[in-house]
Each structure stands twice: as structure tokens, then as C-alpha cells.
């Protein structure tokens, strides 16, 4: 089942708030929006540092495409089965705020010696406003 959600601060203040505060990108197994931050942390299976230069903005027609760079060669700290929901998350480890969670391809992830994985980039769009109805 696809898991996609964002924090109310992200919705209210846009990607600038997350870009200024988020310091980590991670692969998470079976995330739930209502998870406490401690529960969320327990679901992280791989993570990497994130900085403001990892955020890219590009016009896309009337919309704005936002891409957050993925990370490669990450040593996993946990495992996932192909039946688990895997998602990419962007969060602030100091402020304990999960800004974005975006569904990723579910697959088996092992944590054997020498295993590495790639955390995919997140891509989303800020849409042009729509007419009043």
C-alpha cells in the first residue's frame, strides 16, 4: 500500500521550512503518519545526512518541481521483506519532525556484512493554484 504524507508545517510553510531544518533522508519500513518520532526512528533501515544543497527547484510548466537528492552506497542498519511498505523520509532529527514521506519500491533489504543500498531521490510538485469554485 502506498504511503505518502507530509507534516502540517510543510503544508503551511512550504519546502523552505523543510530545507532549512531537515538534516536526514532515510529509508523507513511501514511508516504511519500517526507514529511518534520514537516509533518512526525505530522503523529506519538506512539513513544519510541531508543538507540544503540537496534540494533542487525547477520550473515544470506552470508548476514547480522539487527534487531532493537521493544518496548512494548507504550501509543499512535494518532489514525489510518484500511484503513491507518501504518509504523515503526527510526529517529533522533535532526538532524531531518528519516533513515528508514518499512511497518507494518495496523489496527485500538485507543487512549482511558489506551490503549497501541507494536511497532514491524524492520528487514532488508544487502545483499552480486552481480556479475558485
Predicted regions located by residue number:
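Small cysteine-rich, disulfide-bonded extracellular modules of the LU/uPAR three-finger superfamily
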Residues: 1-86, 93-133
Amino acid at each position: 500500500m502506498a504511503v505518502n504524507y507530509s507534516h502540517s508545517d510543510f503544508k503551511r510553510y512550504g519546502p523552505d521550512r523543510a530545507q532549512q531544518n531537515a538534516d536526514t533522508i532515510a529509508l523507513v519500513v511501514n511508516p504511519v503518519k500517526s507514529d511518534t518520532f520514537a516509533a518512526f526512528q525505530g522503523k529506519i533501515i538506512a539513513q544519510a545526512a541531508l543538507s540544503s544543497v540537496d534540494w533542487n527547484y525547477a520550473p515544470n510548466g506552470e508548476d514547480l518541481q522539487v527534487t531532493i537528492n537521493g544518496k548512494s552506497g548507504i550501509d543499512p542498519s535494518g532489514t525489510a521483506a518484500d511484503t513491507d511498505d518501504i518509504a523515503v523520509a526527510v526529517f529533522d532529527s533535532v526538532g524531531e519532525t518528519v516533513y515528508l514521506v514518499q512511497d518507494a519500491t518495496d523489496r527485500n533489504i538485507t543487512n549482511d556484512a558489506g551490503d549497501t543500498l541507494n536511497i532514491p531521490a524524492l520528487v514532488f510538485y508544487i502545483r499552480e493554484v486552481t480556479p475558485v469554485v
